[in-house]
Structures are given as C-alpha cells and as structure tokens.
Amino acid sequence: MELKMPALAIWSPEDEVLGAIAPLALGVAAGTALIVDLDVAGPKYAGDLTLASLVADGPTKSDLSPQRRGIAVVRNGGVDPEDAEQVLRALVDGWPAVVFRLPADHIGGDGAIPILPLIPGSMLNRPAGPAVYQRAGWRVRVPEGGIVLPRPRSGTIAALLAGRVPHPGDRWIRAWRRVWEQSWA
C-alpha cells in the first residue's frame, strides 16, 4: 500500500464512538502507525504515554520511531496541541504513518478529514468537501468525493474498544486503507 500522506488528521463531529475508534482503525490499516490524540478531553486509550508528558519531558529516541510493527497510541494528557508543535513535527518525521485525532468540535477547513455516519436526511450540518462515510443500516446516496466504509463486524468494534487490534485482513480495516491511498490535498 502506498501512503499518499504520512500524516492524516481526522475528526468525527457527529459520532463519539466513531471518533474514538476511527483513528485506531486507520492506524491498523497503515500497518505501522502512531495515533496521537489532540483532544484534551479525548478517550481514555490504553497506555501510559501522553502528549503532555512528551511536551514536559521531551520525547525519547524510542518515542520518535516505531520499535515494532503495529500501532502505538499517545493519549493527550491535558496539553493544547499548539503547545506540542515541535514534538508533533518530530513524531511525524520519525514514524511511517501518523494519525492525529481531533476533537469533535473541530471547525474543519484545514485539511482534516471528517469521519461521518452515512445516514439519510439533511438535518445535520455537514462539513463541505470530501469525507469518509461509515455505512449504517440505510441505503443512502454517497456524497461526491467521499469514501464509504462497509459496516464493521461487531467483533472488530469490540476489539478496538477493548484496546485490542483486530486482524489486519478484516474487511472494515482493509477499507480504511483507501483513506491512506487517497490524495486529500
């Protein structure tokens, strides 16, 4: 798989669960990736490493590049992303793929990719431009420029929510590879 961009910023303004698991799925789809939560009030991902500690103590050599294949997660820990800019740049330089998880109230318009449930109707105020859509139980026309993910298996979601990595051959995980392969610029 060819990564068009080594770092992607995503957010899910409409679905909190999707906002928590999408960065993990995107990381698993890349093979080896770092997921960095830029949301001060983000999910309680497993692990001890936080962006706040990397800013306060400085990253170690082992923080700046993968030590094994798979995903690593950096929880936020209460730091504003603007205060972490140097650390974030160093992480992007050292990792083959980085996923930045943005808060649900992110405004957009800065190249970040919205992850949205594919639901009928027009009640929701959707961000303009391309997006990743999560198929739900309805047949809905896909907005132009969007990537549509198939419905995930319940075991896949359960694994991600429990801090386990689903099989990389999982249909839903494989579908996330298209997000890496797309040119979002």
Pin down the residues of each PLM region.
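Glycine-rich P-loop/Walker A and Walker A-like loops and their local beta1-loop-alpha1 context
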Residues: 3-28
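Hydrophobic anchor at the start of a short beta-strand
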Residues: 32-33, 98, 112, 130-131
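P-loop/Walker-type NTP enzyme "switch/lid" segment
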Residues: 6-15, 34-97, 104, 155, ...
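Short, charged/polar "capping" segments at the starts of alpha-helices
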Residues: 42-45, 108, 121-126, 138-143
